[in-house]
Curated annotation (Swiss-Prot):
Binding partners and assembly: Heterotetramer composed of ParC and ParE.
Subcellular location(s) per record: Cell membrane
Record site feature (Interaction with DNA), residues: 17, 53, 55
Gene symbol of the encoding locus: parC
Name of this protein: DNA topoisomerase 4 subunit A
Single biological process term from Gene Ontology: DNA topological change
Length: 110
């Protein structure tokens, strides 16, 4: 049972994978709620990597991109500014140094 709890499977309580939960938590700790100013995505990814998720930055940023794309999630958890991809090519997002983000109104409900 312990192995299943630490896997990258969505939790039944909120539907988030561990990396997604860490991104939302780190953004809330940075004060990036829905009414705050946008902050560079590289800052958020660096904070997540340094404190909570010691894996590659591309995996963390791709998880954040999926949470920001309105065509990937029914209720996007991240409000993004910049090039976050297109519905016909979702992998065409810009590098994290060119995008900015904050939490959406939906993520404040978590």
């Amino acid at each position: 049972m312990y192995v299943i709890m630490d896997r990258a499977l969505p939790f039944i309580g909120d539907g988030l994978k561990p990396v997604q939960r860490r991104i939302v938590y780190a953004m809330s700790e940075l004060g990036l709620n829905a009414s705050a100013k946008f902050k560079k995505s590289a800052r958020t990814v660096g904070d997540v990597l340094g404190k909570y998720h010691p894996h590659g930055d591309s995996a963390c940023y791709e998880a954040m991109v999926l949470m920001a794309q309105p065509f990937s999630y029914r209720y996007p958890l991240v409000d993004g500014q910049g090039n976050w991809g297109a519905p016909d090519d979702p992998k065409s997002f810009a590098a994290m140094r060119y995008t900015e983000s904050r939490l959406s109104k939906y993520s404040e409900l978590l």
